[in-house]
């Protein structure tokens, strides 16, 4: 039996296609290394193995039998593992690009939007992958799930009006799928699908308010720790992510006031994902004065609120008054509806003021859930605050 016949027999007999492919590629690489080193003192079995592999190129073997291999990969729903194995040994990824349509069609057929989206992200970060993705955009838009490109719109839009129109049509006709992609990235709980319609409605309302199209949805960042995906829609910011801290938190005027902030919970009451819509702020802070940051932090601390995730990445300057708006109108949002425990004290902050954007780790000072971190300014600010309070107390007692 030839090596290729043995390979096909193994694929037929064993369910773990990716492991079989991995083993044969590794075998081929080992044989090449041995041949290069010209080892002659080998056992009879290895001599026979070398003989069976003479003239055999494993990469070409995989290419010839790619359809058979892919059928096995589809059965296991293991596309990402498969391409990772191929790219590990074939760094130029050419074998993947040669079979791009087959691989993407298989992932699309499986229908796991999170994996399909991750596959596209994976491809564009490989050598020449961005160009391959762009070249194949017409093919991708014709698949059953074109919405999986939602995080990569910036790569393909603006090239010509015809393509932009095609992208918009594909996305707008799969608006439910866009919401599903975002939520499935935040949670693997099957019950997250119960909130797809809710997020779809929220996105449509933002687009309407900002007079924008689906083509204008831009992923601008992956939040700190990769817990949130952040999208810009006009002057609004949409965050979709996994929960990190307590959802309910104390309110303060130094916190960016959201238009909407929702916790999506399963039937057991466990939070699967958090969604927040807020106004865009200026995060390009050129003069980063720690004293200004301490002043902000101290305002909260004086009111019994502790913010423990203090970094410049988590603040920004207001572009307008700290009041959310919709359709050009300022909106009053009940604190409880936005996950706050209370109304904040004082007047809304004006344009140019520094506010907190990331609210995952804001606690009441006596909270049993309070968490400190070894990074950022919070610990040093707390130490300074206690020393200053102790000095003030000494002054009063004199």
Where do the language-model regions lie?
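ATP-binding glycine-rich phosphate-binding loop
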Residues: 177-178, 184-234
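ATP-binding glycine-rich loop module of kinase domains
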Residues: 223-252
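Active-site-adjacent loop/helix micro-motif of nuclease/hydrolase catalytic cores
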Residues: 243-252, 285-293, 365-372
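Conserved structural core of kinase catalytic domains
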Residues: 254-293
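Conserved protein-kinase catalytic-loop position immediately C-terminal to the HRD catalytic Asp
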Residues: 313
